[in-house]
Structures are given as C-alpha cells and as structure tokens.
Amino acid sequence: SCLEAIDELVLEARQIAVDQSSGELENRPTAAQEIKNIYDQILQLANTKLGDTYILSGHQTDTAPFTRDANYNATYHGDDGDKRIIVGDKLDIKVNVTGEDALRSGVDVFDALRDLISGLEDPNPAAGTAQIAAQITPMSNALDQIKAVRAEAASTFTQLETTENQLANFKL
C-alpha cells in the first residue's frame, strides 16, 4: 500500500539521518540528494489516485493532496473529511485516511525531511550536524505515527470484512 511504502521511505530517511549525524562531511551532498529523492517519492505516494480519486485528500478527491515549492515546503490541499460506509442499523465505519492524518497529525513528515535536507546542505559543519541529529527523533515519531494510521486502516478493513461475512451468512 502507499502507506507501507511511505513508512519504508521514512525509515530510510531516518537511517540516513543517523548515519550522517556523526559529522562526516564528504557524503553529505549525496545524502542530501537521497533525502530530496525520498521527499519527492513520499509526495508522489501521498498523491496516489484510485481511479480518478485522490485517496488521501479527504472530501477533496479531485485535488492532489500535496504540492511542494522549490524550497521543499509542502502544502496540504485536502481536508479532514471522513468517508463513511453504512454497515448496519445506525452503524457506519470511517473508511479513509487523510494526508493530514498520515503525514502531519503529530510530526509533519515533510517539514522533518526539509529540515534534514537543510542540515545536510548547511555550510557550517557543526550547525549542520546538530540539525541532522535533531531530525532523528521526529523521524522516529513519524514512523510511529504512520504505523498507527496503518493499523487503523487495517482494523477498518478487518471490520468491513467481518461485516461482509456476517451479511453473507444472514442472507443464507
């Protein structure tokens, strides 16, 4: 799924931050480019469509949820609208995740990546190292945040499957 792929990319970015926080300067330009690529891959995944519908935009399904500017500042264009399916008498289930939920609800993944890029490109080695190291905890928290959203989505899927099976048995 797109959230699983985003999770793997954030994990990769966190590992780069850990590796680069040692203060070695010669690999920083390459690492900065790797983080820029990860940023753009996450942006592309966050803008995933199912048919003609952006899946992380809330109710704004015809709008790409995220854009970025040249300075790696991301803007969210979706909303926090829930999509719900009625599964029984007075029972409905939320069946979507928004980009805000997945990527900005606690830690703003895009801001953390931008700050990591800034640290990797900082001409002052000590300041750059401090900024890189400062992104390790936000990256760890972002991983927890994404895992929680993935777990919620998996739980919803299981609940929908259970309801479907119950309805199929009821019809027999």
Predicted regions and their residues:
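Amphipathic alpha-helical polymerization modules
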Residues: 1-62, 118-172
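Cysteine-poor, low-complexity segments in flexible/peripheral regions
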Residues: 64-125
